[in-house]
Amino acid sequence: MGRYVIRRLLQMIPVFIGSTFLIFVMVYALGDPVAALFGDRAPDPATAARIRAELYLDQPLWKQYLHYMGQIFRGDFGTAFNGQPVLELMSTAFPVTLRLTLVAVVIEVIIGIVLGVVSGLRRGRAVDTGLLFLTLIVISVPTFVTGYLLQFLFGVKWGLVRPSVSTDATFEELLLPGVVLALVSLAYVTRLTRTSIAENVRGDYVRTAIAKGLPRRRVIVRHLLRNSLIPVVTFIGTDIGALMGGAIVTERIFNIHGVGFQLYQGILRNNSPTVVGFVTILVIVFLLANLIVDLLYAVLDPRIRYA
């Protein structure tokens, strides 16, 4: 297991370099950051040249990337155009988004798996058909429509929750945004669990467990569910990074100053250091989540062994 982890970590290095370089090129290809810094006013040529030199923008792109990677390994993600260190922005944005993501993941895991098990065990019945139809609707409706609708109903019309999240962003305030963020993923988890349960319920090991007289709950939890969760774990593992990076719409609706908010502001103002820095961390989150998912396979299925 230890050698497998080391091998996977080494394999992450070229993936990390390739993905961050691609992001770096795409972000800096959007336009001149110095021109975006001055807005509609044309900068003085001498001032523009000085700023480009300070930001290392007067060098070829590959040299800029090497300079940026050197900064990262020193724990320096650069400085935003407003003079604030990107690391300082991360220290305020990531904790909020992590809490929001945690709420969303808990909701999609608990509710999604429970609904998937119920649907899979009752395949072809009214409950199964109803859940499939409901999840299809959830997947089809855009997140911003669901977000504004739930915000209006629960926050404005009924007054059950705050319409927007305060700067403290407590778990209680993040409950409704977490539901909005988790809804589409919850629908996919429900469908994945349902399909996996429906396929494995006919397996020989399930029939053997039932023939031995084991309680129905034990057969479902210890045998059927454990073997059916591998595709679900794969989806959830990759979905964690997607939720963190894809929270832009949800954070905009509920005025949450997290990663999505900072990315939106960075893209809007062509603030390249902010965008590249935040996306770099999201790449690391994706890679680590995939590694954890692979390790969980061996826990869920004893037949899987890593040399």
Task: Go through the PLM ranges and name each one.
Residues 2-3, 92-127, 143, 167-307:
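Alpha-helical transmembrane segments of integral membrane proteins
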Residues 3, 7, 39, 50-53, ...:
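Short amphipathic alpha-helical coupling elements at transmembrane boundaries
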Residues 6-15:
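N-terminal signal-anchor/signal peptide hydrophobic helix marking the start
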Residues 15, 122-137, 141-143:
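Small-residue-rich alpha-helical segments with characteristic i,i+4
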Residues 15-66, 154, 158-174:
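Hydrophobic alpha-helical transmembrane segments of membrane transport/permease proteins
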Residues 21-29, 66, 70, 133-162, ...:
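Membrane-water interface segments at the C-terminal ends of transmembrane alpha-helices
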Residues 52-62, 76-87, 163-170, 189, ...:
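Membrane-interfacial helix-loop-helix junctions in multi-pass membrane proteins
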Residues 58-113:
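An internal, D/E-rich "acidic patch" concept
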